UniProtKB/Swiss-Prot annotation:
One GO cellular component term: photosystem I
Organism the protein comes from: Calycanthus floridus var. glaucus
Similarity field: Belongs to the PsaI family.
Highest taxon of source: Eukaryota
Name of this chain's protein: Photosystem I reaction center subunit VIII
Keyword Coiled coil set for record: no
NCBIfam families (UniProt xref): PS_I_psaI (TIGR03052)
Topological relation to the membrane, as annotated: Single-pass membrane protein
Biological process according to GO: photosynthesis
Transmembrane portions of the chain: 6-28
Length: 36
């Protein structure tokens, strides 16, 4: 059960976290460029 449960929780978590981190780093990069 755990072998089937872990990927089903892990994959959507990564699928949501990776774009969120990418968007956050992108927005911070844009803010730094605007300030400078």
């Amino acid at each position: 059960m755990t072998d089937l449960n872990l990927p089903s929780i892990f994959v959507p978590l990564v699928g949501l976290m990776f774009p969120a981190i990418a968007m956050a780093s992108l927005s911070l990069h844009i803010q730094k460029n605007k300030i400078i």
